[in-house]
């Protein structure tokens, strides 16, 4: 085999292997983190169920000073909508509360527009136990090929998980005041 053919074939084989590995990743992804908060579920629920309260705890609101939000629909609960734009790390998109059970759970449809389009469901569940409420924040969505490819090089669970951990710590601080 000539040297030129080897030089061309090796990178092509490596790229093919990476693409094949990426294609074999699961079609659905899920990220989940939990936090114990010393507050009643009703207090925590109010912080999550109303998008106007998210700047008190949501990491993207705290990390990106260029982020701007617009609200529509009811102030809280099912049908509440928050749209955001940013020239920074938060990108742009829309969130809508699609299910809300007082003191128990909230489902939020999250549609990212930029930097990459994606459609996910965030779920917050609240499980009281004595004076402590266990809050679980999870996100599930379709693992598009671009995300599968990125996950070959970047641990997406760790990256999104840090965001959730920060948000839950902020939520804990806000709820325990």
Predicted ranges, named:
Residues 2-24, 56, 63, 83-134:
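Hydrophobic-ligand binding "helix-grip"
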Residues 3-75:
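Hydrophobic ligand-binding cavity/cleft-lining segments
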Residues 32, 70, 85, 152-155:
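Conserved short-loop catalytic and cofactor-binding motifs
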Residues 32-34, 81, 123:
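Short, acidic/polar N-cap/turn motifs at the starts of alpha helices
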Residues 41, 45-54, 79, 94, ...:
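Extracytoplasmic/secreted envelope proteins and their assembly/folding machinery
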Residues 49-56, 87, 99-102, 169-176:
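Sec-exported extracytoplasmic/periplasmic mature domains
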Residues 76-82:
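Short coil-to-beta transition motif at edge beta-strands of beta-rich domains
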Residues 109-166, 171-174:
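Beta-strand/loop substructures that line and gate deep hydrophobic ligand-binding cavities in soluble
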């Amino acid at each position: 085999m000539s040297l030129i053919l080897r030089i061309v074939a090796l990178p092509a084989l490596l790229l093919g292997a990476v693409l094949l590995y990426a294609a074999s990743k699961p079609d659905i992804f899920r990220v989940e983190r939990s936090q114990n908060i010393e507050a009643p579920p009703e207090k925590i629920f109010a912080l999550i169920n109303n998008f106007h309260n998210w700047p008190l705890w949501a990491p993207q609101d705290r990390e990106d000073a260029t982020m701007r939000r617009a609200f529509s629909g009811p102030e809280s609960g099912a049908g509440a909508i928050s749209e955001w734009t940013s020239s920074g790390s938060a990108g742009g998109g829309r969130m809508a509360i699609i299910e809300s059970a007082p003191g128990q759970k909230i489902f939020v449809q999250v549609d990212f527009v930029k930097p990459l389009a994606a459609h996910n469901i965030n779920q917050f569940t609240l499980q009281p136990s004595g004076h402590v409420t266990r809050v679980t924040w999870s996100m599930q969505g379709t693992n598009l090929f671009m995300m599968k490819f990125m996950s070959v090089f970047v641990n997406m669970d760790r990256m999104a998980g840090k965001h959730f951990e920060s948000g839950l710590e902020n939520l804990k601080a806000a709820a325990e005041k």
